[in-house]
Every structure is written in C-alpha cells, then in structure tokens.
Amino acid sequence: MSVSIKPLEDRIVIKQVEAEQTTASGLVIPDTAKEKPQEGVVEAVGPGRIDDNGNRVPLDVAVGDKVIYSKYGGTEVKFGGQDYLVLSARDVLAVVVR
C-alpha cells in the first residue's frame, strides 16, 4: 500500500503492528494491560538529512521493511482513516530480517 504522506528529512512513516490480543495459553489481554507496540512496517521514507557539508545522508530503511523502534519515539497521526507513526530515523533500532 502506498501512503500519500511524504515525510521530510530523516523521518519515516510506519504502520504499527497490532499488539497481541491473547496470551499463548489463550487468555484475553485487556487494552489497559497491552504494551505499546515497538514493531511496524515502513510505509514511506523521507529523502534523508543534510550533513554539515551539504550532502544528503540516505536512510538505512526502505519502504516495506519491518522495523523495531524506540518505545516512546515518534508522533502518532491519523491519515485517511488509518493510524500511522511518524518518527525520526534515529528512533529506529533495527530492521527485522527474515
């Protein structure tokens, strides 16, 4: 899916992966007890920041990458009826490789 949000500089738009609804033993987890998700799929990537020499520094992630990001990083936004997270590239901790 292509998002019509174009992030600026080193920002990334992420679609969060939903938190588990039940435990391995089948217990339902109430919304108040769920942890904030830290995984998501990259939907859009900015062009990168400009370094001190005026060169553009490309980002290490691409659209479609599954990433793990800082628990409290980013800003939640609603666009086109969908919830997204816009965060800085430095808030991305790792790319999940399968």
Swiss-Prot record:
Annotated SUPFAM superfamilies: GroES-like
Keyword Aminoacyl-tRNA synthetase: no
Places the protein is found: Cytoplasm
GO BP term, example: chaperone cofactor-dependent protein refolding
Domain of life from the UniProt record: Bacteria
Record keyword Transport present: no
Its biological purpose: Together with the chaperonin GroEL, plays an essential role in assisting protein folding. The GroEL-GroES system forms a nano-cage that allows encapsulation of the non-native substrate proteins and provides a physical environment optimized to promote and accelerate protein folding. GroES binds to the apical surface of the GroEL ring, thereby capping the opening of the GroEL channel.
Subunit composition and interactions: Heptamer of 7 subunits arranged in a ring. Interacts with the chaperonin GroEL.
Family, as annotated: Belongs to the GroES chaperonin family.
The protein's name: Co-chaperonin GroES
Organism: Leifsonia xyli subsp. xyli (strain CTCB07)
Gene: groES
